[in-house]
């Protein structure tokens, strides 16, 4: 477990939380009521504020991910999925929702709109070589191991 500092812009909204004891990501809540027309009508997404700011420890990042239930039942996803939050970002977290359905989606303040997955990462130190070592797979990609 890692400690993450959080600032609530809107103290009436719950803190991001895990839906179950086995959940990997925390639910994020909408700070506003919103109306999200289908993508084909507006040609983009709608940026929704979550009402929180976080300070991730150095060496950690967070991904903002779609909620599977919203996607499956309503056609709602995230335009720039996954959204990446770096450890040095201190602004409010926003979610750029997109509506793939054919009907307008009406979201309510306090509804769960996305998930936040916090992960540890390592910085890369490149070592340039003239040729990479061979593997059994080689350069096989795009379904080369079967569908």
Curated annotation (Swiss-Prot):
Pathway assignment reads: Pyrimidine metabolism; dUMP biosynthesis; dUMP from dCTP (dUTP route): step 2/2
The UniProt entry's coiled-coil ranges are none
Question: Which UniProt keyword terms apply here?
Answer: Hydrolase, Magnesium, Metal-binding, Nucleotide metabolism
Q: What class of enzyme is it?
A: hydrolase
Keyword check for Metal-binding, yes or no.
yes
Q: Which GO terms describe its molecular function?
A: dUTP diphosphatase activity; magnesium ion binding
Which residues are listed for substrate binding in this entry? 67-69, 80, 84-86
Cofactors named for this entry: Mg(2+)
Q: Could you list the residue ranges that cross the membrane?
A: none
Swiss-Prot/TrEMBL catalytic activity: dUTP + H2O = dUMP + diphosphate + H(+)
Give the highest taxon in the source lineage. Bacteria
E.C. number, please? 3.6.1.23
Matching Pfam families:
dUTPase (PF00692)
Q: What is one Gene Ontology biological process annotated in the Swiss-Prot or TrEMBL record?
A: dUMP biosynthetic process
Task: State the InterPro entries in the record.
Answer: dUTPase, dUTPase-like, dUTPase-like_sf, dUTPase_trimeric
Q: Which family does it belong to?
A: Belongs to the dUTPase family.
Summary of the function given for this chain in its UniProt record: This enzyme is involved in nucleotide metabolism: it produces dUMP, the immediate precursor of thymidine nucleotides and it decreases the intracellular concentration of dUTP so that uracil cannot be incorporated into DNA.
Q: What is this protein called?
A: Deoxyuridine 5'-triphosphate nucleotidohydrolase
Tell me the organism.
Answer: Dictyoglomus thermophilum (strain ATCC 35947 / DSM 3960 / H-6-12)
Question: What lineage is on file?
Answer: Bacteria, Pseudomonadati, Dictyoglomota, Dictyoglomia, Dictyoglomales
């Amino acid at each position: 477990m890692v400690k993450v500092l959080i600032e609530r812009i809107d103290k009436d909204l719950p803190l991001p939380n895990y839906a179950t004891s086995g959940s990997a990501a925390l639910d994020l809540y909408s700070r506003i009521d919103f109306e999200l027309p289908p993508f084909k009508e507006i040609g983009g997404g709608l940026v929704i504020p979550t009402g929180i700011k976080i300070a991730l420890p150095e060496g950690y990042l967070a991904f903002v991910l779609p909620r599977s239930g919203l996607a499956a039942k309503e056609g709602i996803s995230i335009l720039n999925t996954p959204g990446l939050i770096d450890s040095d970002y201190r602004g409010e977290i926003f979610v750029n929702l997109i509506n793939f359905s054919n009907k307008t989606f009406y979201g309510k303040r306090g509804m769960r709109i996305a998930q936040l997955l916090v992960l540890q990462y390592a910085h890369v130190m490149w070592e340039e070589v003239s040729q990479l070592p061979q593997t059994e797979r080689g350069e096989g990609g795009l379904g080369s191991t079967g569908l």
